[in-house]
Amino acid sequence: MLAKLDRLLSQANIPLTDQQKQQLVDFVKLLDKWNKAYNLTSVRNPDEMLVKHIMDSLVVSQHLQGQQFIDVGTGPGLPGIPLAIANPDKQFVLLDSLGKRITFIKNAIRELKLTNVTPVLSRVEEYQEQQFDGVLSRAFASLNDMVDWCYHLPNTSGHFYALKGQYQPEELAEVSKPIELVDVIKLNVPELVGERHLVVLNR
């Protein structure tokens, strides 16, 4: 699995240390192991997880601005844990409302010895602890839902980072709260079938 990850990282031009690569492989192994009992992801094959979960998360890394991030609806820690491994200098809060996901994330943090991840069991609208440089999510079906539920989370210069498949410009027109489009970035995820985009917004 390490050899495949090496190849994917090379294709995506993402430089990581040997320790970071090993942490990512160990995370996939943990996810695969826990998935059998907890049903954390519909992706069952570890090699597929490397592409659909690890690489799909890591390609966002170079576009992040700031130090404090929250991953809303993180599920089993995606994209938060891969991004935290790749960015040990940044802090990540991983938020989810389902206990089994947060239990898995706590275990992964312990096993991988991550010091820059804080798991939080909460609904997003009830989380008022702090504001962030970036609000990340792969979980929302529409931009309007993401902005609506997470509007209180970015700080004054913070951004929303929405990981999407295809980007439909009309989605932006459906956002009910005041928002500004900063960028739409086409992401290159090696071996992934289908388009991926990062939509960057600010208030």
Swiss-Prot record:
Signal peptide stretch: none
Enzyme Commission numbers on file: 2.1.1.170
Domain of life: Bacteria
Binding positions (S-adenosyl-L-methionine): 73, 78, 124-125, 138
GO MF annotation, one: rRNA (guanine-N7-)-methyltransferase activity
Alphabetized Gene3D superfamilies for the sequence: Vaccinia Virus protein VP39
Pfam families, per the entry: GidB (PF02527)
Statement: the UniProt record of this protein carries the keyword Signal: no
Keyword DNA-binding: no
Alphabetically ordered keywords of this record: Cytoplasm, Methyltransferase, rRNA processing, S-adenosyl-L-methionine, Transferase
Disulfide feature: none
Subcellular location: Cytoplasm
Residue intervals passing through the bilayer: none
Entry GO terms, CC: cytosol
Family recorded in the similarity comment: Belongs to the methyltransferase superfamily. RNA methyltransferase RsmG family.
HAMAP family reported for this sequence: 16SrRNA_methyltr_G
Its job: Specifically methylates the N7 position of guanine in position 527 of 16S rRNA.
Name of the protein this chain belongs to: Ribosomal RNA small subunit methyltransferase G
Record organism: Glaesserella parasuis serovar 5 (strain SH0165)
